[in-house]
Amino acid sequence: MSAHQQGTELDLSWISKIQVNKPAVLRRAEQIQARRPVKKEWQAAWLLKAVTCIDLTTLSGDDTASNIQRLCYKAKYPIREDLLKALNMHDKGITTAAVCVYPARVCDAVRALKAAGCDIPVASVATGFPAAQTHLKTRLEEIRLAVEDGATEIDVVINRTLVLTGQWKALYDEIRQFRKACGEAHLKTILATGELGSLTNVYKASMIAMMAGSDFIKTSTGKETVNATFPVAIVMLRAIRDFFWKTGNKVGFKPAGGIRSAKDSLVWLSLIKEELGDEWMKPELFRIGASTLLADIERQIYHHVTGRYAAYHDLPMS
């Protein structure tokens, strides 16, 4: 990942008069979803690009060392080698961007990747994920422990109460403390947009998170009733663009929650390309948080190469 985004001093004038035009956002969301996705060879290339941007995730109560090991193996070998050879991509080092786990499973992931001779980053959720309803000291200590165990990316989740009650300085101060606790680890800030009440709040929370030094802003925990949606994404991407114009600092974007199909990933890539440009279409600035997306991408690539859809036994690790 690129160098840390240092953030700025808190400037509430950047958000004080913001009002999001919801009808315009909804029209833009409908437009992007109505586009025809890329086809044939271009589609295979875009799907492989999507693979390299996935944070391959497991966040289940029954996670164990063994399924973390399988997750890490799949992260290193996301697409069957014969399929990559057919596309002349077998020597390109294609892996997922990272694996993402609970703090208690960080050591398992670090060990598994080390045993595989792989330097894929380990991301850990933190700060009382998914609700953030724990004491601040506890949330900060959780970050420090995850980093100590080997996580190099930390996906924190904000206290939604601070957004819903307009406590923007308190939100900024908390995220600044998260930034400090991360040390050299990169900070991804989950806004849990499905619980923020309005698109205007989504924009304001995005801007505060970036001012406070977030390297990425992320839509959702994946545990909310409403997760990554295109209207929310458009608002967050416009905030990223505005922040870049104001500061020259590039902040990454990570949608997460409910992204399951290869077609979904193509639409997300198209949205990034149109809203932020080609420079953001790389894992340093774009991630997709997903558990099952990779399996469908591999099935679509299998179909592209062989002309038929895979049976269950054809892709046993998917």
Curated annotation (Swiss-Prot):
Mind telling me what this protein is named?
Deoxyribose-phosphate aldolase
Q: What is its main location?
A: cytoplasm
**What does the similarity note say?**
Belongs to the DeoC/FbaB aldolase family. DeoC type 2 subfamily.
Keyword annotations: Cytoplasm, Lyase, Nucleus, Schiff base
Q: How does it assemble?
A: Interacts with YBX1.
Function, as annotated, reads:
Catalyzes a reversible aldol reaction between acetaldehyde and D-glyceraldehyde 3-phosphate to generate 2-deoxy-D-ribose 5-phosphate. Participates in stress granule (SG) assembly. May allow ATP production from extracellular deoxyinosine in conditions of energy deprivation.
What would you give as a GO molecular function for this chain, any one? Answer: deoxyribose-phosphate aldolase activity
Record field: catalytic activity: 2-deoxy-D-ribose 5-phosphate = D-glyceraldehyde 3-phosphate + acetaldehyde
Quick one: which pathway? Carbohydrate degradation; 2-deoxy-D-ribose 1-phosphate degradation; D-glyceraldehyde 3-phosphate and acetaldehyde from 2-deoxy-alpha-D-ribose 1-phosphate: step 2/2
The top EC class is lyase
Q: Name one GO cellular component term.
A: cytoplasm
Name the domain of life. Eukaryota
Organism equals Bos taurus
Subcellular compartments? Cytoplasm; Cytoplasmic granule; Nucleus
Pfam families attached here? DeoC (PF01791)
Q: Does the keyword Cytoplasm apply?
A: yes
Q: What is its EC number?
A: 4.1.2.4
Q: Does the keyword Cytoplasm apply?
A: yes
